[in-house]
């Protein structure tokens, strides 16, 4: 296996991860005569063989960062904020980079709009973790980790210091010791400490001892024993080190000690100490649940016996910087060593009061470091193929955990060590550590762990030695005894040298012939504490023995160095005592003679102390070669005989030995498991049928027991996994492979079962252990395949698949079939064994794909699929899914051929079929599982570095593309999924489609129109399900009422839009948070000096508690869970969600663009009449919350789509689509973010351009007006100011700006460039057109129309709460809305009806009636324009006379611009008649009967055309009543007044738009001047603030700006009179209406006047001679009655009349009134009462003589004295003529009055005659001619 090719498939791993010397040179001898030993040595000694393909491949692509996606709202501008923040701080990039995501090495990304959606959906994809969730998933085991799962502790001696000074060398040993059980747990680690002046560079003072421990325990401690040179008699005694008072050695004493230590080779016990390692109150677990603050031996720091001091030291990496390590080290100062006063024993170690031993005045400093003995150790070793002393030396690099393919190896990332340096010594430590990094193996001694010989674990390494512990020798007198120990082969020749089998204490020295113990100085009962390690031979005879020689040495310096004297000998035969664990007592011989072991010789020997057993010792055998169990030894012996064929081949002894293996105790069975399995496999491969079956049955029994006795619950026992994965090598190719024999014997057993034979309970055991045999068969095949092509394969080429022999393959097929049958039958019974067996069969096929011809694997897979075909029970279907998921994870799965040579993708097609069946399954968990499998497989392809080429991605996409077809064929299946499953399917569809080429993709759109529609339904679902919403808006459950079934009930759900795996990832991350600093891993049961590190910081623990509390609550909200996350995790989550939404939208946009291009060439099947696929997806884009990146990519595509398909998209059939697009473009035009807003403007221009070419602009105006109206209810156009008044909002301003920019030719080019469109986008002429129809004037007209509608809506909104109080403003607002939305008849009518209702509430009947007439007019005009009504243009003109607002300007266009849901389709004759009747009713209430008549005349033609005679009768009855009412009004002596009119002027800034404007108000006839003053004061006082007051100007004079005060708002209210159409406004007469003046005229007024008297002499008042008059005529914007109560004064003219003209006018006015009364015709002569009353009233006011009143006052003023001289002659003559005419008419009236009166009025008539005569007499004084005239 030294060649490269074998290494392509298998990796050789060194077996021995420990740096130990070569164990036994005796093993080099020839072992051919002991085949079982050969097996053992080969099992332990050869390198492991690891199949690198077995657990799959996955090479993750380079991690990359997600881009922050910006999702803007109407009032946000995150883009600008981020840009400004970036400008302020350059470090923000580093922060963003820390939130990394999945890489996007998308080779074809240039043709794509965005990154693929899958990485954002699965940002934390963990291939190993996903595989681990498969039922029956096999996970790799690391052998070293699986057997030493506890702790590794390293100890290094730093220094030894005494109060009296360190002069002589000291030696010592350290071992792990269990105080409770009083036993050593490890062998000794030796060290020595030389005085400074005696140090030698070669001494290993830097040595480090490494100890292994299963689990922390309070009783585990370090036992430290110190030795020094045996004390010289009469020399300096060891008591100098323990005296209480300070002792200082003299120079002579120091010299003497140094000389003595050099010549004396023997040592004595000096002191000892016990150092507890762990807390007293900890539990004996393996550490995961231990408290992170558990200290390392608090007794060291606080106990009375060991006043130790702890100092954390920093880890130093090889570059000198502080680094990270899995370990933590402490420096321990042991200040109280116990001096050995006399021989001590284990009991004295337990003595708590230290009565026997004095304390030594010295300090021993140790550095103790712990390491997790985890997977990293072994992997570091195995991946590099060489032994590395990992993490023992802190200067070594960290174990590369990422090399592990085992998910359990992740321990939460690097951990911080303590970085504080506490002393100079710590620096020395670091210096020493650094200096030792060159040869780490030489400086570490791995002490053998005695527990490894008693654990229920297989032996992995070769160890074969005996530990000898001399305990005591009891002599009759005091001596200085010590013992020499040696191993001899026999006792024949006592002069023969012993075997070199004793391990030395010094490192790096070869095995020695003997070793000496300590000297027990002056002892009668000498005790020893030595540990002697003896290397044993591979096999031993009864003559192999240990020989102990006892010496006495004189401890005095004479002429030469002291020589020891032999005292006696003792021997111990190995074969007799090798198994003994208790104390052994031996007699001591005085002399040694040949054959001293033989019983006959022993009788002649002379013994010390009368032959008593005075020598006591202990033995500890540690061997992985020599089984202590007798049955195992018997099996080995019979195996040897069978192999060497020393017995007949049918030997029943071997069968018996094989069968007896089932009775071996579990410990022995486990310890020798691997060699036993190897030997049984050898028998299965090479033995006869009987032997094969026996060996197979024994093997099954052993495997079952191993599975039962191991303490883990895994389906695949870790010991067996290690055997298959590492240890099993199929005999290194030296023997035929195992798999044919194994398959044969197993297959025969299976077939026997299938035939119904009784095969015993062993068969069920075979099934439960089937995974083991299947993996053995596979590895055996793989090894054979590798060796077959070992030498003839060019370097670097893949090993070709191996064609199995027909017989072997048939056997495997039969076996597979039998096992399948078992799965099928047992699944139906619901047995979990069936599921495990199913997974094992899947992995069997998975493995075979690497080894044998895929066609042969196809046979197995198709056999499986035939057995499980179609829809089956949920348990069976789940098994089938698991089977497919396992095989599909294979690297070669895309190449697996079928039976037909053209069928290269059998597996992918069957996978797609079964996944779809899963989605359609009744069982909800199976749906979730099917969807999940799809995503996981796609993730593996997408994120695997080996599949990044474009052709690979295309090939994989083509393989999966039929899945999209399946979905389209069975859409109800998709709709029946819940939201989570839908997302899984859709993300898979998007990923598949993304990597497809256009040729493949177009196939999905070529089959049928319905199928293409369904495809885009899927795209719509993508946009819906992945829409980005705020976390607060998300709901815990999906769209479907049932939640995702794939997750456990306790699994919290942080996000809906991301993969379900993310929830587990975040849950785990939340739990790990608390470990970020000061975790159980970092402070694993070790002392923390810094109390702040003893527990995690508060926020972390609070967050973790909250997360746990939230996850434990049923139905905890996703928002609460998100809040419980660490901010970094929450930021990651939001980033991922933003990206998945953005990437999905961009991907759908990319698909839409492709579709649009294909549709242009008519290559696909779609509805070319409407292009509904494009319209629905575009609408869906707009209606979802999209990222800024999307909008930037969208509008060029939007423009391209309208260029290609403008004619279709702008057709009437797509009105609904256009309306929605227009709505969303206007909505985006409101956005604060300029990038979005400007693109919306471009979108509107694109729509306008298309309308100019493909439709009427009027239709687009109607569309945009409609959408603007709808938008007003969505957008907040006002906001409250601090003074609680409303003002225009930013949204409204931005919309106004956007509508203006739409028509701004100057900004157009820059706008297009900013949005990534060509400069001439708007000028490009579409195909089939020759002229450029783009017109900025048209766009401007459209823009102005929309701005008008916006202003009206804004004005209406700004009224707000004022509307209820200020009914005038409210009505005006409704009116403006009605006019602004006139392009849309429905909206126009809606606002007019609102206005009508408002007027009715105010009882303004005439105005309400006008609204109804206007509505009817809109409908009538539309009907006339369509020529489908009963009316003509003459009727419209008649209606316009009633309501001049009825105009043809808008409605002609609007009737043509019908939009779906709006427009002329709802305008019918019936609705017009309805509103005409409403107007008739309202005019009746207003008593304007002449309007009622006109309206009924418009209704009558309708009934005539329909021959509705009943209705006609009613109409004529109504007309009769109306004309009678008109007659009543005319015959009433009191003139009929329908309304009063008032001029109101507004002056003041608080009036806003009303400031400096005048209005004429139309009020009910009973409203007087005081009433309207009060009403308006009430309205406008509420609008004043503390800085403004309201003032009413009391007169009607002209207001001058300089007269107005700041802070005062003025109202000027004046009563005005309506002016008739033909009235002479220049007449000086006073205006007194009688019935005769307007009886037959329509009461429609648009001019008004009022007269204002004034003087020119400065006086406020004067006589008639000074009284001038100003007549003001006002022209209003429209005519009354109007749609509103007030109209703006557009024109104001004034006339002035002199005082005499005033007087003449007054007289002429009275004359005319009287003459009119005399000449008025009456209906009958008898009807004289009204006339009499009217005549009496006029005469009484004309001829009653009163001082300074009437006619007489005029004469007095102008015809007497000085004023008469000022009159011009013409004026004088006019005045006299007027007076004479007046008197003549009065005389005539008196005569008429006499004819009309009765008796009762005679007295009144007499008064009139007297008054006339008196008046004539008075006037004659001024006008003498009057007497003659009358």
Curated annotation (Swiss-Prot):
Membrane topology classification: Peripheral membrane protein
In this UniProt entry, the residues modified to Phosphothreonine are 1079
| Entry keyword annotation includes Endoplasmic reticulum | yes
What region holds the C2 DOCK-type domain? 463-622
What are the protein's UniProt keywords?
Acetylation, Auxin signaling pathway, Cytoplasm, Developmental protein, Endoplasmic reticulum, Guanine-nucleotide releasing factor, Membrane, Nucleus, Phosphoprotein
GTP-binding recorded as keyword: no
Q: Provide the tissue specificity.
A: Expressed ubiquitously, in roots and aerial organs.
Role according to the record: Guanine nucleotide exchange factor (GEF) for Rho and Rac. GEF proteins activate small GTPases by exchanging bound GDP for free GTP. Controls actin polymerization via the two heteromeric complexes WAVE and actin-related protein (ARP) 2/3. Involved in cytoskeletal reorganization required for cell shape (e.g. trichome and cotyledon) control and tissue development.
Record's protein name: Guanine nucleotide exchange factor SPIKE 1
Top-level taxonomy:
Eukaryota, Viridiplantae, Streptophyta, Embryophyta, Tracheophyta
């Amino acid at each position: 296996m030294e060649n490269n090719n074998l290494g392509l498939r298998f990796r050789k791993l060194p077996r021995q991860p420990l740096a130990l010397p070569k164990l036994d040179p005796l093993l080099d001898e020839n072992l051919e005569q002991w085949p079982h030993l050969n097996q053992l040595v080969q099992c332990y000694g050869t390198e492991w063989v690891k199949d690198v393909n077995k657990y799959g491949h996955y090479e993750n692509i380079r991690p990359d960062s997600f881009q922050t996606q910006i999702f803007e709202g109407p009032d946000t501008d995150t883009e600008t904020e981020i840009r400004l923040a970036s400008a302020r701080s350059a470090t923000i990039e580093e922060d963003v980079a820390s939130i990394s995501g999945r890489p996007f090495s998308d080779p074809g990304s240039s043709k794509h709009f965005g990154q693929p959606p899958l990485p954002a959906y699965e940002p934390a994809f963990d291939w190993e973790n996903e595989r681990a969730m498969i039922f029956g998933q096999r996970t790799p085991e690391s052998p070293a980790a699986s057997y030493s799962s506890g702790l590794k502790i390293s100890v290094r001696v730093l220094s030894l210091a005494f109060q009296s000074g360190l002069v002589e060398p000291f030696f010592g040993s350290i071992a792990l010791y269990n105080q409770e059980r009083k036993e050593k747990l490890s062998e000794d680690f030796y060290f020595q400490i030389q005085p400074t002046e005696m140090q030698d560079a070669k001494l290993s003072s830097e040595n480090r001892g490494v100890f292994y421990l299963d689990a922390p325990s309070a009783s585990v401690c370090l036992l430290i024993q110190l030795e020094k040179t045996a004390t010289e008699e009469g020399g300096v005694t060891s008591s100098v080190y323990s005296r209480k008072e300070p002792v200082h050695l003299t120079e002579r004493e120091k010299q003497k000690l140094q000389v003595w230590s050099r010549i004396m080779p023997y040592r004595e016990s000096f002191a000892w100490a016990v150092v507890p390692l762990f807390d007293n109150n900890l539990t004996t677990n393996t550490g995961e649940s231990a408290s992170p603050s558990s200290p390392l031996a608090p007794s060291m720091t606080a106990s009375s016996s060991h006043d130790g001091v702890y100092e954390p030291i920093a880890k130093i990496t090889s570059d000198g910087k502080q680094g990270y390590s899995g370990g933590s080290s402490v420096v321990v100062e042991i200040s109280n060593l116990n001096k050995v006063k006399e021989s001590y024993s284990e009991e004295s170690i337990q003595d708590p009061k230290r009565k026997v031993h004095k304390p030594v005045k010295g300090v021993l400093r140790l550095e103790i470091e712990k390491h997790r003995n985890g997977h990293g150790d072994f992997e570091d070793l195995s991946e590099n193929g060489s032994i590395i002393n990992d993490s023992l030396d802190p200067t070594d690099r960290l174990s590369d955990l990422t090399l592990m393919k085992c998910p359990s190896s992740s321990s939460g990332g690097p951990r911080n060590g303590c970085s504080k340096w506490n002393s100079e010594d710590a620096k020395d430590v670091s210096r020493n550590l650094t200096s030792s990094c060159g040869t780490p193996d030489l400086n570490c001694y791995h002490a053998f762990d005695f527990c490894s010989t008693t654990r229920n674990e297989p032996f992995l390494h070769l160890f074969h030695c005996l530990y000898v512990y001399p305990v005591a020798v009891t002599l009759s007198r005091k001596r200085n005894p010590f013992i020499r120990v040696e191993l001899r082969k026999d006792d024949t020749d006592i002069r023969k040298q012993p075997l070199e089998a004793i391990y030395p204490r010094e490192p790096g020295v070869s095995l020695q012939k003997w070793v000496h113990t300590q000297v027990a100085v002056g002892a009668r009962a000498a005790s020893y504490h030595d540990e002697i390690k003896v290397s044993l031979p591979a096999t031993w005879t009864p003559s192999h023995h240990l020989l102990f020689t006892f010496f006495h040495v004189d401890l005095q310096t004479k002429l030469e160095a002291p020589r020891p004297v032999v005292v006696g000998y003792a021997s111990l035969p190995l074969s007799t005592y090798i198994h003994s664990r208790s104390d052994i007592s031996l007699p001591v011989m005085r002399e040694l003679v040949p054959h001293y072991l033989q019983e006959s010789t022993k009788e002649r020997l002379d013994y010390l102390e009368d032959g008593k057993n005075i020598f006591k010792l202990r033995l500890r055998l540690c061997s992985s070669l020599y089984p202590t169990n007798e049955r195992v030894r018997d099996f080995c012996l019979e195996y040897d005989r069978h192999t060497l064929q020393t017995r007949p081949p049918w030997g029943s002894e071997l069968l018996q030995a094989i069968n007896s293996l089932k009775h071996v105790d579990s410990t022995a069975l486990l310890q020798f498991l691997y060699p036993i399995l190897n030997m049984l496999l050898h028998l299965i491969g090479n033995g006869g049928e009987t032997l094969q079956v026996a060996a197979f049955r024994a093997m099954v029994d052993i495997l079952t027991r191993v599975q039962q006795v191991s303490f883990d619950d895994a389906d695949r026992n870790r010991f067996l996994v290690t055997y298959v994965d590492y240890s099993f090598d199929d005999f290194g190719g030296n023997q035929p492979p195992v798999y044919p024999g194994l398959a044969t014997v197993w297959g025969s057993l299976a077939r026997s079962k299938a035939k119904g034979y009784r095969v015993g309970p062993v068969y069920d055991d075979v099934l439960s252990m089937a995974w083991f045999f299947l993996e053995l068969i596979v590895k055996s095949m793989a090894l054979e395949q590798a060796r077959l092509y070992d030498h003839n394969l060019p370097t670097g080429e893949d090993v070709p698949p191996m064609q199995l022999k027909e017989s072997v393959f048939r056997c495997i097929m039969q076996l597979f079939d039998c096992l399948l049958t078992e799965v099928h039958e047992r699944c139906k019974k619901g047995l979990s064994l069936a599921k495990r067996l199913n997974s094992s069969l899947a992995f069997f096929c998975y493995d075979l794909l690497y080894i044998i011809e895929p066609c042969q694997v196809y046979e197995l897979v198709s056999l499986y699929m035939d057995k499980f075909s179609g829809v089956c029970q949920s348990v069976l279907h789940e098994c089938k899914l698991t089977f497919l998921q396992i095989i599909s994870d294979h690297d070669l799965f895309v190449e697996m051929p079928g039976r037909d040579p053209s069928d290269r993708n059998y597996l992918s097609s069957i996978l797609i079929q079964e996944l779809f069946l899963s989605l359609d399954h009744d069982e909800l968990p199976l749906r979730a599982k099917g969807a999940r499998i799809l995503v996981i497989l796609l993730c593996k392809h997408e994120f695997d570095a080996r599949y990044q080429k474009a052709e690979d991605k295309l090939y994989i996409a083509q393989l999966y593309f039929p899945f999209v077809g399946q979905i389209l064929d069975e859409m109800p299946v998709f709709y029946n999924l819940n939201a989570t499953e839908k997302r899984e399917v859709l993300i898979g569809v998007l990923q598949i489609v993304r990597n497809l080429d256009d040729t493949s993709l177009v196939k999905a759109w070529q089959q049928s129109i319905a199928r293409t529609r369904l495809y885009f339904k899927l795209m719509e679902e993508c946009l819906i399900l992945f829409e980005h919403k705020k976390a607060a808006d998300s709901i815990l459950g999906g769209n479907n009422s049932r939640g995702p079934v794939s997750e456990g009930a306790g699994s919290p759900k942080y996000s809906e839009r991301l993969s379900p795996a993310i929830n587990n990832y975040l849950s785990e991350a939340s739990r790990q948070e608390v470990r970020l600093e000061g975790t159980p891993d970092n402070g694993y049961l070790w002392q923390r000096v810094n109390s702040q590190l003893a527990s995690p910081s508060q926020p972390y623990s609070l967050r973790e508690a909250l997360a746990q509390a939230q996850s434990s609550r049923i139905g905890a909200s996703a928002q609460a869970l998100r809040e419980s996350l660490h901010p970094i995790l929450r930021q990651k989550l939001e980033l991922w969600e933003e990206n998945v939404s953005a990437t999905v939208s961009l991907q759908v946009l990319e698909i839409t663009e492709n579709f649009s291009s294909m549709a242009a060439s008519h290559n696909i099947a779609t509805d070319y009449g409407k292009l509904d696929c494009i319209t629905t997806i575009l609408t869906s884009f707009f209606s979802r919350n999209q990222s800024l990146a999307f909008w930037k990519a969208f509008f060029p595509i939007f423009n391209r789509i309208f260029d290609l398909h403008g004619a279709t998209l702008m057709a009437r059939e797509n009105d609904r689509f256009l309306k929605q697009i227009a709505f969303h473009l206007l909505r985006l035009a409101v956005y604060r973010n300029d990038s979005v807003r400007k693109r919306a403007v471009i979108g509107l221009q694109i729509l306008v351009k298309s309308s100019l070419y493909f439709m009427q602009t009027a239709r687009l105006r109607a569309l945009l007006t409609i959408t603007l109206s709808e938008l007003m209810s969505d957008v907040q156009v006002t906001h409250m100011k601090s003074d609680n008044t409303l003002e225009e909002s930013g949204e409204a301003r931005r919309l106004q700006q956007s509508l203006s920019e739409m028509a701004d030719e100057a900004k157009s080019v820059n706008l297009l460039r900013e949005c990534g469109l060509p400069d001439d986008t708007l000028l490009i002429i579409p195909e089939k057109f020759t002229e450029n129809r783009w017109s900025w004037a048209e766009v401007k007209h459209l823009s102005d129309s929309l701005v008008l509608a916006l202003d009206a809506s804004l004005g209406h909104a700004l009224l707000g709460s004022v509307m209820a109080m200020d009914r005038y403003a409210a009505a005006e607002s409704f009116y403006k809305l009605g006019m602004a939305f006139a392009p849309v008849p429905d909206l126009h009518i809606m606002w007019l009806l609102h206005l009508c209702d408002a007027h009715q509430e105010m009882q303004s009947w005439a105005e309400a009636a006008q609204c109804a007439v206007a509505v009817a007019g809109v409908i009538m005009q539309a009907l006339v324009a369509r020529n489908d009504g009963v009316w003509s243009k003459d009727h419209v003109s008649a209606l316009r006379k009633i309501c001049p607002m009825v105009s043809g300007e808008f409605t002609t266009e609007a009737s043509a611009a019908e939009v779906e849901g709006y427009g002329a389709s709802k305008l019918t004759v019936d609705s017009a008649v309805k509103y005409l009747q409403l107007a008739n009713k309202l005019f009746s209430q207003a008593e304007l009967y002449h309007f009622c008549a006109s309206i009924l005349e418009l209704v009558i033609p309708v009934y005539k055309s329909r021959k509705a005679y009943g209705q006609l009768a009613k109409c004529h009855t109504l007309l009769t009543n109306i004309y009678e009412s008109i007659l009543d009004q005319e015959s009433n002596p009191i003139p009929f007044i329908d309304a009063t009119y008032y001029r109101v002027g507004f002056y003041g800034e608080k009036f806003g738009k009303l400031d400096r404007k005048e209005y004429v108000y139309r009020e009910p006839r009973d409203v007087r001047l005081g009433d309207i003053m009060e009403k308006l004061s009430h309205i406008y006082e509420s609008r004043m603030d503390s800085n403004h007051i309201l003032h009413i100007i009391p007169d009607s004079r002209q207001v001058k700006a300089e007269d107005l005060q700041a802070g005062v708002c003025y109202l000027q209210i004046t009563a005005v009179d309506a002016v008739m159409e033909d009235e002479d406004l220049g007449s000086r007469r006073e205006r007194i209406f009688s019935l005769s003046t307007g009886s037959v005229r329509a009461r429609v007024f648009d001019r008004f006047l009022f007269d204002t008297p004034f003087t020119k002499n400065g006086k406020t008042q004067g006589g008639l001679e000074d009284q001038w008059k100003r007549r003001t005529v006002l022209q209003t914007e429209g005519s009354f009655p109007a749609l509103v109560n007030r109209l703006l004064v557009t024109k104001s003219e004034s006339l002035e009349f002199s005082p005499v003209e005033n007087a003449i006018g007054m007289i002429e006015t009275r004359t005319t009134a009287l003459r009119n009364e005399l000449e008025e015709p009456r209906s009958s002569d008898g009807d004289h009462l009204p006339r009499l009353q009217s005549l009496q009233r006029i005469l009484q006011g004309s001829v009653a003589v009163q001082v300074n009143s009437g006619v007489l006052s005029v004469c007095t003023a102008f015809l007497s004295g000085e004023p008469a001289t000022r009159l011009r002659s013409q004026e004088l003559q006019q005045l006299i003529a007027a007076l004479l005419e007046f008197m003549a008419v009065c005389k005539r009236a008196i005569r008429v009055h006499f004819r009309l009166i009765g008796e009762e009025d005679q007295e009144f008539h007499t008064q009139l005659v007297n008054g006339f005569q008196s008046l004539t007499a008075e006037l004659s004084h001024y006008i003498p001619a009057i007497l003659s005239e009358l």
